[in-house]
Amino acid sequence: IVYRKGTGNYLRGQAWGRETGIYVVPSAGGKPTLVTDDGALPQFGAAGDRVYLMRYGDEDKRSLVSLTLAGADLRTHATSEAATEFRLSPDGRWLAFTERWNVFVTPFVPTGKAVEVGPKASAVPVARVSKDAGEGLHWSGDARSLHWSLGPELFSRDLKEAFAFVAGA
């Protein structure tokens, strides 16, 4: 299990807001291990040996980074000027992101250099999958569909509807 431990506040109090950061803990139980003290929206990669998370960098630039479960080998995979959420597909082949309230999908190509993603990115194909807006991105277990919400509604889109080169399109 990977999770973010946040700070306390005036509603919850400060007692449980110490030692914030991104943690991993075995699903069978055990002691949580700190991966990093900086980041949000953590998730495991396809192999389960890395934690992917979102970070805010210089001049408010957003990044999708990953680290080993021990917090080593920091890699920056994608950057964006305005993304508010990154979600890697369970098979590690696709990256969904929200930017300016819309939901987009692009192939995830792990390279030695970060790829700039956005609606007008040209390095890799990008497809807008939301009609109006969306948040709370999550993938189906088989990575064939992306789901998101908008207010009280839940939406889904198959990848084959977004990209002609996906099998079954």
Residues of each region from the PLM?
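A short helix->beta-strand "capping" segment at the edge of beta-propeller domains
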Residues: 121-130
